[in-house]
Amino acid sequence: MDISVIRQKIDANREKLASFRGSLDLEGLEEEIAILENKMTEPDFWNDNIAAQKTSQELNELKNTYNTFHKMEELQDEVEILLDFLAEDESVHDELVAQLAELDKIMTSYEMTLLLSEPYDHNNAILEIHPGSGGTEAQDWGDMLLRMYTRYGNAKGFKVEVLDYQAGDEAGIKSVTLSFEGPNAYGLLKSEMGVHRLVRISPFDSAKRRHTSFTSVEVMPELDDTIEVEIREDDIKMDTFRSGGAGGQNVNKVSTGVRLTHIPTGIVVQSTVDRTQYGNRDRAMKMLQAKLYQMEQDKKAAEVDSLKGEKKEITWGSQIRSYVFTPYTMVKDHRTSFEVAQVDKVMDGDLDGFIDAYLKWRIS
């Protein structure tokens, strides 16, 4: 690596470190760590196991933030010392480049940690896909998005599970609900909340005309045991029905599918993928809890954007992102203006650039 490039990277890292320091209250962080450590030494600390686990997790996260920042400062000092030696001893070049690479890796990870610092960012996620305007074409578009998000989740190491699948009339889907289990699943996937627009030559049109279709994506955090949502049994109406897999496969001869209606709000959720009625009811209850909690948060104006974003009509002019297959190829996010020409890569689950741009756009 050329020495001028090395100097530029070191200068850029110095500025980035200063920016990190500006966003952190190191003294306050030290005080919070000390308070939690003292709390964990109290004799009755583990009497409430759920609260204790939450405190322990919070302490580990604070310590990780604090220690990682100081690790970056140490590495920055080391590379600046090595740069001084480089003028007299070229043998330190490889060590300097290796230290720079390690620092870049830590900084990238640390920056993502700062971007994912909002409530519920660390939770698992529930993602729903609802085709809108466009009929069969839109339902096929929904199926394409299902494939895209499944591939993204698998690439991230998330456990991706189908909670409910409603096949389209001729092709694609009428709706699908997915769960993503893994670190920061909601924090990453919340960027996908909104209307997604497709422009292509429709394979369902014998005249080979260009069609525009829309599909809505909703994302909610899956609630853990530290967040309680009270649901009275009297407020729930449960219906059961025969369920099957994607495309109508493995249709059950007994009514294992479960549909729950929350009478006071009219919210309806359903699960069809488990082989037992009990399993589907448990999944549906988790979905209902997430929806009720999100609805309650939406009543607080300050939290609307942080949990759900703007809910728009599934039609022209409301899209957050456009996927153009013809007459040129492009995927563009209309919130951040981030765009790429490799539409096939995006459809294969390469969403990192869009998600990173969205997270930076939110905090700016």
From Swiss-Prot:
Listed A to Z, the keywords are: Cytoplasm, Methylation, Protein biosynthesis
- Where is the PTM N5-methylglutamine found along the chain? 249
One GO molecular function term? translation release factor activity, codon specific
Which is an annotated Pfam family here? Answer: RF-1
Q: Name one GO cellular component term.
A: cytoplasm
Q: How is it modified after translation?
A: Methylated by PrmC. Methylation increases the termination efficiency of RF2.
- Superkingdom of origin organism: Bacteria
Q: Known InterPro entries for this protein?
A: PCRF (IPR005139), Pep_chain_release_fac_I (IPR000352), Pep_chain_release_fac_I_sf (IPR045853), PrfB (IPR004374)
The compartments listed are: Cytoplasm
Regions crossing the membrane: none
Function of this protein? Peptide chain release factor 2 directs the termination of translation in response to the peptide chain termination codons UGA and UAA.
Its family remark reads: Belongs to the prokaryotic/mitochondrial release factor family.
Task: Report the NCBIfam families cross-referenced here.
Answer: prfB
Q: What is this protein's record name? A: Peptide chain release factor 2
Q: Which organism is it from?
A: Streptococcus pneumoniae serotype 4 (strain ATCC BAA-334 / TIGR4)
